[in-house]
Design a protein with these regions (language model features):
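Small-residue-biased structural context
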Residues: 1-166
Length: 166
């Protein structure tokens, strides 16, 4: 999948999101040298930090600079964008619940399931953005429009937007 430079920064960030998703689904890292905790509570803390420093700002950038263009210029883009925004909201709520320390016995017992569910949702969401949204945008948006997205994302990053790290 060759990405237009206007969408490439988001695709690079998506890679980091997919790594996080895999770790949450599996409950471990597939890289034996990775500094990834075995304890699910520590993994939850890592997810919360990753969300606050990377994924949340990434969602904000997509919602501000990419989704309005897709809704306007892509066939059936408004429906696709609405579904992606709904996903963003659901993931924000999931992380908020983890951060709020919903720590009753049932919540603690189901931490594994909640982290796995978040990872599965994030993975599915990224795949839709990469395979549907970005592909349609590259096919249907003008080169000028994609360059404008690139400019806006560059400005967003310069203003302190996400720079993904695990």
């Amino acid at each position: 999948m060759k990405r237009h430079p206007g969408l490439a920064p988001l695709s690079r960030e998506h890679h980091h999101g997919l790594v996080m998703a895999e770790r949450l689904v599996l409950g471990r890292s597939t890289n034996p040298r990775a500094d990834w905790p075995a304890d699910r509570a520590e993994q939850s803390a890592r997810l919360i930090d990753f969300f606050q420093t990377n994924l949340g700002p990434h969602f904000d950038a997509e919602e501000a600079h990419v989704f309005p263009v897709a809704a306007r210029d892509v066939t059936d883009g408004d429906r696709l964008v609405r579904a992606l925004i709904d996903d963003h909201e659901a993931m924000r709520e999931m992380v908020s619940a983890l951060a709020a320390g919903e720590a009753g016995p049932a919540a603690r017992a189901d931490l594994d399931g909640r982290l796995r569910a978040f990872g599965e949702r994030l993975r599915r969401h990224i795949r839709i953005e990469e395979r549907e949204l970005f592909e349609r945008m590259q096919a249907e948006c003008s080169p000028e429009t994609l360059r404008e997205i690139e400019t806006r994302l560059t400005e967003h990053e310069a203003a302190g937007g996400p720079s993904c790290r695990l």
